[in-house]
Amino acid sequence: MLEQGYHLYEAVQFLAIHAPSSAQKKMNAMLMDLRSGYPLHKALDHLQLPQDVQLLLYVSERNGDLAQGFRKSGELFKKREEMKRKWEGAMRYPLLLIIVTLLLMFILMYFVLPHHQTLYRSLQIELPVITKLVIACSEKLPWLFTAFFVVAILLVLTYFVTFHRFPPTKKVTVLLRIPGLSQWTKEVITCLFCLTLGGLLKGGLSIMEALSICKEQDFFLFFRSEGEEMMLELENGERLYECLRRRPHYLKELPFVVENGEKTGNLAKDLLYFSDYQLEEFERRVKKWLVAIQPIVFSMIGAVILVLFLAMMLPVFQMIGAI
């Protein structure tokens, strides 16, 4: 609508008319803020958008290209929701099977197997190894579940008591030390940095001006300290790619992208292209995980059911063979 010549207020007003009742209240509050002279990024607080989406809109507001910013943030939000739906859809059936399998294990281990064990003892039948293992596991399961829940509660408490209160730089440092989360953290920070800086540079700002805006924004607090530190380093004569190369929280390819962009004069274009590439790579990996996770879960469930079946039936076959 902005590309068709509508003013921002008119576009939001038009969308509010056709929005669901729950969204209309938020959009009307947003309209009141716009009418009162608040900037867009402040008025958007009523919509409770994700921080990365708000950051993109803030950048587009500062460089004067709101239409492109809304399109880019909309695409990002749409991809996020699509991946979320695919993940939920792929995990719904396996989770149901896991719950059913756990119930089956509970019934067999605590109601059926004890009676069979008493019967086989009275008949002086030696139980197979697999049945003994299942019985031993059933005796340890309550302790394992208790330990699991205690650890889960401790992790939640640790997050809210300590990690949640850490400054942004320390949070990133902790995440980089956790296996499995380190690479994901680098990808998220790199992608947001490229989208933010690339969008600002595309609007005609210099690198120093773009970093100054990063230092002022309130949506991604980590970039506030990053912007301030990088500005000091650039004032001391360093190049941007040298600043990035020393930082462990960016992908190792980013300094080369920045160095090449500075040489060719296409830094904004290269940063935006690199961010799009990283988003596509992340989406491709998620799809790959979704394809792989279902067979793995089904195989594990099948193996558990097979073990329970053998634990129940082998003593029966052994008893029949002894007759």
Curated annotation (Swiss-Prot):
Transmembrane stretches, start-end: 93-113, 141-161, 188-208, 296-316
Keywords: Cell membrane, Competence, Membrane, Transmembrane, Transmembrane helix, Transport
InterPro entries referenced in this protein's UniProt entry, alphabetically: GspF/PilC, T2SS_GspF/T4SS_PilC_CS, T2SS_GspF_dom, T2SS_GspF_sf, T4P_ComGB
Pfam families: T2SSF
UniProt membrane topology term: Multi-pass membrane protein
BP term (GO), one: establishment of competence for transformation
Primary localization class, coarse: membrane
A single Gene Ontology CC term: plasma membrane
Keyword flag Membrane: yes
Localization of this protein: Cell membrane
Biological role stated in the UniProt entry: Required for transformation and DNA binding.
Family according to the record: Belongs to the GSP F family.
Protein name: ComG operon protein 2 homolog
Organism lineage string: Bacteria, Bacillati, Bacillota, Bacilli, Bacillales
Primary gene name: comGB
